Curated annotation (Swiss-Prot):
UniProt keywords, alphabetically: NADP, Oxidoreductase
Name by which UniProt lists this protein: GMP reductase
Catalytic activity: IMP + NH4(+) + NADP(+) = GMP + NADPH + 2 H(+)
Domain of life: Bacteria
InterPro entries assigned to the protein according to its UniProt record, in alphabetical order: Aldolase_TIM (IPR013785), GMP_reductase (IPR050139), GuaC_type_2 (IPR005994), IMP_DH/GMP_Rdtase_CS (IPR015875), IMP_DH_GMPRt (IPR001093)
Source organism of this protein record: Streptococcus pyogenes serotype M49 (strain NZ131)
Keyword Disulfide bond among record annotations: no
Free-text function comment from the UniProt entry: Catalyzes the irreversible NADPH-dependent deamination of GMP to IMP. It functions in the conversion of nucleobase, nucleoside and nucleotide derivatives of G to A nucleotides, and in maintaining the intracellular balance of A and G nucleotides.
Gene: guaC
Length: 327
């Protein structure tokens, strides 16, 4: 049925440069607008327990970056919103679709967060559509992100239900094994799936998963993403919440998927795994490097801002961009 869809992923694509029109890469504007707010970069650290905690969320918000707090400490979400608002910072939280979450959303009327992400593995579901409608009824000013999905039909349905943005990506992440455990997903063709979904979208798309290099951020924007959610590149920092482990004198940080047994606390419907990543310095350094690399991407695109990346040509090179090398 879908054999006529071009299938490719990040490592299969090279973007083609245009004439540079800026005198310094620092002139390139990497900012992005989502809802009523502008942020420094079109990247979001994944809303996973080994990536973000309240301290990191606060740091990101203060420095002008977008964040989404995970939903795995349910009782702390309301105090978190209050604490962020007391500091004049945006509150961005996650919810699931269980019955208790409906009451929780209703309880936020007095102090509504600016952003809510409905965060489940298979977002093309009646349960997600119902939750979108509930949030929009109870908290009409809150920006709703819904996901995750992998088809144009799913994007259209969630947008029609009231979602302000959709998150695209099922199983392409480094610690997600959905594609292996279930046979379904966008693993191995995430960039093509993003392109496919973006053609149907009327609202922002957030590409989620499969990002392995900073250049993949530019490629995501080229193929229709407004923002990019990233896990592994944000894991393993000194500040990261993941447990620190020492192996043969080297320091590592734990990084595990949201559907792993380590997250769930039980071995049931497991679609995630745990890995150890070498500790890699401070989060702020990674964010700075991401911005600099994205500014370089904009300069190669021949523009001054992120929009220039959407209009460049590209070639499909089928796994050959590394030419036998690795980063």
């Amino acid at each position: 049925m879908f054999n006529d869809i071009p299938v490719f992923d990040y490592e299969d694509i090279q973007l083609i440069p245009n004439k540079c029109i800026i005198t310094s890469r620092s002139q390139a504007d990497t900012s992005v607008t989502l809802g009523k707010y502008q942020f420094k970069l079109p990247v979001i650290p994944a809303n996973m327990q080994t990536i973000i905690d309240e301290t990191i969320a606060e740091q990101l918000a203060k420095e002008g970056y977008f964040y989404i707090m995970h939903r795995f400490d349910e009782d702390s979400r309301k105090p978190f919103i209050k604490r962020m608002h007391e500091q004049g910072l945006i509150a961005s939280i996650s919810v699931g679709v269980k019955a208790c979450e409906y009451d929780f959303v209703t309880s936020l009327k007095e102090d509504a967060p600016e952003f809510i992400t409905i965060d489940i593995a298979h977002g093309h579901a009646n349960s997600v559509i119902d939750m979108i409608k509930h949030i929009k009824t109870e908290l009409p000013e809150t920006f709703v992100i819904a996901g995750n999905v992998g088809t144009p039909e799913a994007v259209r349905e969630l947008e029609n239900a009231g979602a302000d943005a959709t998150k695209v990506g099922i199983g392409p992440g480094k610690v997600c094994i959905t594609k292996v455990k279930t046979g379904f997903g966008t693993g191995g063709w995430q960039l093509a799936a993003l392109r496919w979904c973006a053609k149907a979208a009327r609202k922002p798309i957030i590409a989620d998963g499969g990002i392995r290099t900073h250049g993949d951020i530019a490629k995501s924007i080229r193929f229709g993403a407004s923002m990019v959610m990233i896990g592994s590149l944000f894991a393993g920092h000194i500040e990261s919440p993941g447990k620190t482990v020492e192996v043969d004198g080297e320091t590592f940080k734990e990084y595990y998927g949201s559907a792993s047994e380590y997250q769930k606390g039980e071995h049931k419907n497991v679609e995630g795994k745990k890995i150890l990543l070498p500790t890699k310095g401070h989060l702020s350094d990674t964010l700075t490097e991401m911005q600099q690399d994205l500014q370089s991407s904009i300069s190669y695109a021949g523009g001054k801002d992120l929009d220039s990346l959407r209009h460049v040509d590209y070639v499909i090179v089928k796994n050959s961009i590394w030419n036998g090398d690795s980063i």
